[in-house]
Design a protein with these regions (language model features):
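Asp-based phosphoryl-transfer active-site loop
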Residues: 6-27, 237
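Short active-site oxyanion
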Residues: 46-52, 72-73, 161, 222-224, ...
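Residue-level signal for inorganic ion chemistry
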Residues: 44, 79, 162, 237, ...
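Short, structured coil segments at secondary-structure junctions
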Residues: 69-71, 79, 87, 185, ...
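Active-site phosphate-binding/coordination module
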Residues: 34-134
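Short, acidic loop-to-helix structural element flanking the phosphoryl-transfer center
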Residues: 28-49, 94-101, 143-146, 201-215, ...
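Mg2+-dependent phosphoryl-transfer enzymes with acidic/Ser/Thr/Gly-rich catalytic loops
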Residues: 4-8, 33-34, 198-286
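Conserved acidic, metal-coordinating active-site core of Asp-based
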Residues: 114-227, 231-236, 248
């Protein structure tokens, strides 16, 4: 038996496992997983641990990345709207948006003319409305292609998540407007990045899906460990018995009760996390 038998470690990808913020803003190639993080994760798995990624990325944008990472657990996608097993190439759980989301968001388009957003689905299809430079950089970063439409009413269903991409005061105004709508409580609305505002189905959060994943794997909550850097990670950090964040995390994450701060993502935070887990799970406890 390994020292990490029965332990689940779930990590956010962007700016937690791999630092991608610079590439998103400037365009460029996705950086690889660092050698230090890779070796630490491989050691964790060799000692019986289950390593999973919990990401806001959609299936088409994470599918090319998954084979490059050491993972032995299913992946949480779409910010908690699905669990996907890359080994079996199938969804284990989905919680997609109701079709009515298109009618709910149509008036938002009217108020914010030229609204930029990405719309994701169960498969590899992506639709975009009014792409801007941020959208194009995001498409390059996620190695994705998309079909451009002019209205969300044209978008086919089912929809897994809607991702708005607006910057500056317009982005702030958009978030305030969306959160003020009478239907806002029917969905999950969360910032997943500095300029990203996402809508998923009610209950479709990383926290809800990490609970489901732990149950699926028969992992006790006391052995669930999570690490993340942004607001969309807070639900799973709150669920975890051992919650971590890299020092580049936003302030709200850093102030989450029980959070343990690590080095910056660019300084191999996940490698430090695994070293911390060695202290939590010494050999004599196995």
């Amino acid at each position: 038996m390994g020292r990490f038998d029965g332990v689940l470690l779930a990590s956010d990808f962007d700016n937690t496992l791999v630092y991608t913020e610079d590439v998103l803003l400037s365009g460029g190639v996705l950086p690889p997983l660092s050698r230090e993080n890779r070796e630490a994760i491989e050691y964790f798995m060799a000692e019986g641990g289950i390593f999973s990624v919990a990401t806001g990325r959609a299936l088409p944008s994470f599918a090319p990345i998954a084979p490059t990472l050491p993972m032995n657990g299913p992946t949480i996608l779409f910010n908690g709207a699905a669990i996907y097993d890359f080994a079996r190439k199938e969804y284990l759980v989905t919680a997609f948006l109701p079709d009515v989301i298109r009618e709910k968001l149509a008036p938002v388009e009217e108020v914010f003319s030229g609204l930029t957003c990405e719309i994701y689905h169960e498969g590899s299809d992506i639709h975009i409305l009014h792409p801007n430079e941020l959208t194009r950089n995001h498409m390059r970063l996620t190695n994705s292609t998309a079909v451009e439409l002019t209205s969300i009413l044209q978008v086919p269903t089912p929809i897994s998540k809607v991702l708005f991409e607006e910057t500056g005061q317009r982005g702030e105004a958009l978030e305030q407007y969306v959160r003020s709508q009478p239907w806002a409580g029917e969905f999950e609305i969360v910032k997943s990045g500095k300029y990203f505002l996402e809508i998923t189905a009610k209950g479709a959060t990383k926290g809800g899906m990490i609970r489901t994943l732990a149950e699926h794997l028969h992992i006790r909550r006391e052995n669930v460990c999570c690490v993340g850097d942004h607001l969309n990670d807070i639900p799973m950090l709150r669920f975890a018995s051992h919650a971590f964040a890299p020092r580049n995390a936003v302030e709200a994450v850093r102030q989450t009760p029980g959070i343990q701060l690590l080095r910056d993502c660019r300084e191999d935070a996940v490698a430090e996390l695994v070293a911390r887990l060695e202290e939590i799970y010494p050999p004599e406890k196995v």
